[in-house]
């Protein structure tokens, strides 16, 4: 579980995607671009935050 994740509007999400794509066109790997943008968002985000639970177990048995 992750607490305090930024809650982004659709517009904010779109801007993040565009920023990731911009960094990738400048030669940055996708993973590095995603990490960079995530750090930028965490550093500047002032809106709501959410708690997220990621379940990696495969329930299809």
Curated annotation (Swiss-Prot):
Protein name (record): UPF0181 protein Ent638_2380
InterPro entries: UPF0181 (IPR005371)
Annotated organism of origin: Enterobacter sp. (strain 638)
Signal peptide: none
Family recorded in the similarity comment: Belongs to the UPF0181 family.
Pfam families named in the record: UPF0181 (PF03701)
